[in-house]
């Protein structure tokens, strides 16, 4: 069942982090979640040419911070910062609080799983052969230092009557190793024959330093081991 689970969801708190960081009580949670989804939808629609990798949302007290990881930051900022100011106002209206937007450049888009998935989807929409698109993206990622990459496409490939899935892989992609730093991306190509899904997994190496949540869990485990040792010593002394 290792391939059935979401590669990011299973690593949350271990080697991956959440894209939204805030706390809300039961009455506010649904509103915050809906606002986050709408903000991401609006930003991806308006800045589709910027190559958005991920959008991180934080909510400190009575404010919000939105960090956009993009391949082309100039598209987001615009001339003299006019475009980003308009975005800030729109996002502020959606979230109902003052918003600060950070634009972070993705230095190597060929190693970002989401950007690779969108690139393959765009090539499929331009009627490029799916095998050529996959092999080109895999070659670029391996050339720039990826330890492994797997790309799978599913749908009516090349206009076939029966939908099927095809995949191509180079290197290692250890999905069941929780310390593995694996990027995951998904995109859809809207072609004349229907929708074709594209999934990308990129293996960057192992993470041996724990995240904040993972470190707390490790501390709890270590604390439990120490308590067990104390209990065993006490039992021996009583005897």
Swiss-Prot record:
SMART domains: KH. Residues 217-239 are annotated as: Disordered. One of its GO terms (molecular function) is mRNA binding. The keyword rRNA-binding applies. GO terms for cellular component: cytosolic small ribosomal subunit. GO terms for biological process: translation. It holds the Pfam family Ribosomal_S3_C. Binds the lower part of the 30S subunit head. Binds mRNA in the 70S ribosome, positioning it for translation. Belongs to the universal ribosomal protein uS3 family. This is Small ribosomal subunit protein uS3. It comes from Xylella fastidiosa (strain 9a5c). The gene is rpsC.
């Amino acid at each position: 069942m290792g391939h059935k689970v979401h590669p990011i969801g299973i690593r949350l708190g271990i080697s991956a982090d959440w894209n939204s960081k805030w706390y809300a009580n039961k009455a506010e949670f649904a509103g915050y979640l809906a606002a986050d989804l709408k903000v991401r939808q609006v930003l991806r629609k308006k800045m589709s040419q910027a190559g958005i990798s991920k959008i991180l949302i934080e909510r400190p007290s009575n404010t919000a911070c939105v960090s956009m990881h993009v391949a082309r930051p100039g598209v987001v900022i615009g001339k003299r910062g006019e475009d980003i100011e308009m975005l800030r106002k729109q996002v502020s209206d959606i979230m109902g609080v003052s918003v600060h937007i950070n634009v972070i450049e993705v230095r190597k888009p060929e190693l970002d799983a989401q950007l690779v998935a969108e690139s393959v989807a765009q090539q499929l929409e331009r009627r490029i052969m799916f095998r050529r698109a996959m092999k080109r993206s895999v070659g670029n990622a391996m050339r720039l230092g990826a330890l492994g990459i797997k790309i799978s496409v599913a749908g009516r490939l090349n206009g076939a009557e029966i939908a099927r899935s095809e995949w191509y892989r180079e290197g290692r992609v250890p999905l069941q190793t929780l310390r593995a730093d694996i990027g995951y991306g998904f995109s859809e190509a809207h072609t004349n024959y229907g929708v074709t899904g594209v999934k990308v997994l990129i293996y960057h190496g192992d993470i041996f330093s724990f995240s904040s949540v993972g470190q707390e869990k490790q501390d709890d485990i270590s604390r439990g081991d120490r308590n067990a040792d104390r209990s065993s010593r006490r039992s021996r002394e009583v005897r």
